Amino acid sequence: MTHSQDLFDRARDVIPGGVNSPVRAFGSVGGTPRMMVKAAGPYVTDADGVEYVDLVNSWGPAILGHARPEVVQAVQDAAALGLGFGATTPAETELAELVTDRVRVAGVDGSPDRRPIEKLRLVSTGTEATMTAIRLARGFTGRDLLVKFAGHYHGHSDSLLAEAGSGVATLALPGSAGIPEAIAAQTIVVPYNDLDAVRAVIAEHGPRIAAVITEAAAANMGVVPPLPGFTAELARIAHDNGSLLISDEVLTGFRVHPAGYWGLDNAGLAADHPDAWTPDLVTYGKVIGGGLPVAALGGRADVMDHLAPLGPVYQAGTLSGNPVAVAAGLTTLRLADAGVYRALDIAADILIYAVELAFDRAGLAYSVQRAGSLFSFTFGTPPEHGITDYATVQAQETWRYPAFFHSMLDQGVSLPPSVFEAWFVSAAMDEASLDRVIRALPAAARAAAAATPPA
């Protein structure tokens, strides 16, 4: 028995399923989760001393790699001054200023820069950020209904688990037990990338729809970018109805571009370009905390000022803006310069090419989807129109992934334990770590090709 197995058995005695987030349990790939005890640069090390190239990267935050010395030092310095005060600190303002300044695209032909984030509220988790965004949208508009897309994951609050991605997709759950029907009925789910479906819902329920929420680029059912012009038209539809557009950048924010997916999608576009779009509210998480629990909700000042203490929409948190966590986030964002994003894109380019080469040589049918440096793949022949929604993602040959995953793991590469999750590269990946992944791919591809569907 490995030490990881022994530790996992011990965990299951006192923690439901042995994990504190379901996808970590290896439920869709089988086997025993590795108990990780150390992370540095592009590597993680398990309780048995085995080192892995990490393509999970804490599910996104570790864009610089693990335990970057400057981030560790900032955390130590902040902790030495106090772990938390229950009061506002200057660092919270610095982080809010950094985000409002960073999330912009340059103006075109002399026009001013476009900045969708006028004010920011810090919270601790992405779930809190999206939950607050929904409450704020309802409070601002005086309406009750929410429109979301099938396969999009916005955290585990009651309003947002219907036909969600991430762990809900991994476990093939319709949502979650424990959500009252009355609450579920306030969320209308439509197919992703289907504007006609959105228009139909608006036509039927328009006066009651407070907001449309969308992942800026879907990345919790695998990576599925919006079709060209989709989000711009979605914004027009929402705004024409008096509804808000909420862009969930918990996963994509500050990972795929210095200004998040909004910056990637709007770069070089004038404000009046037909493909340009501006959300009313944006949620952030993961990278903004640099590996510690920080998330945020930002957007239009007139909407944000409806939050207490200025407005009637209540939100609070004992650990919101925790100084140690904010120090990690501030330092990470300050270090995440243009060179970091070039490194992320180059690493993604190299690995995507290597995956395609290995899959082609193994005779696998597949497709690769990408948004910036985020990418994933689906097994099986994709439909003619490509992978564009939750239904096409779910139709893939998911049964090939466990064999692929465990072959990579056995060769020292840690991948997400679900085919419905993105691969996360880091700027710490060097020639040696990339080479280990590349060398592991051919055998893993052959294992996937040899896999058979369950009886």
UniProtKB/Swiss-Prot annotation:
Main location: cytoplasm
Family: Belongs to the class-III pyridoxal-phosphate-dependent aminotransferase family. HemL subfamily.
Primary gene name: hemL
Protein name per Swiss-Prot or TrEMBL: Glutamate-1-semialdehyde 2,1-aminomutase
Lineage: Bacteria, Bacillati, Actinomycetota, Actinomycetes, Micrococcales
Listed EC numbers: 5.4.3.8
Keyword annotations from UniProtKB, A to Z: Cytoplasm, Isomerase, Porphyrin biosynthesis, Pyridoxal phosphate
Claim: Cytoplasm is one of the keywords in the record: yes
GO cellular component: cytoplasm
GO MF term list: glutamate-1-semialdehyde 2,1-aminomutase activity; pyridoxal phosphate binding; transaminase activity
Reaction catalysed by this enzyme: (S)-4-amino-5-oxopentanoate = 5-aminolevulinate
Cofactor: pyridoxal 5'-phosphate
Residue numbers of N6-(pyridoxal phosphate)lysine PTMs: K286
Pathway this chain belongs to: Porphyrin-containing compound metabolism; protoporphyrin-IX biosynthesis; 5-aminolevulinate from L-glutamyl-tRNA(Glu): step 2/2
Protein location: Cytoplasm
PANTHER family xref list: GLUTAMATE-1-SEMIALDEHYDE 2,1-AMINOMUTASE, GLUTAMATE-1-SEMIALDEHYDE 2,1-AMINOMUTASE 1, CHLOROPLASTIC-RELATED
Matching NCBIfam families: PRK00062.1
CDD domains (alphabetical): OAT_like (cd00610)
HAMAP family named among the record's database cross-references: HemL_aminotrans_3
One family name in Pfam for this protein: Aminotran_3
Subunit structure: Homodimer.
Enzyme class, first EC level, given as a word: isomerase
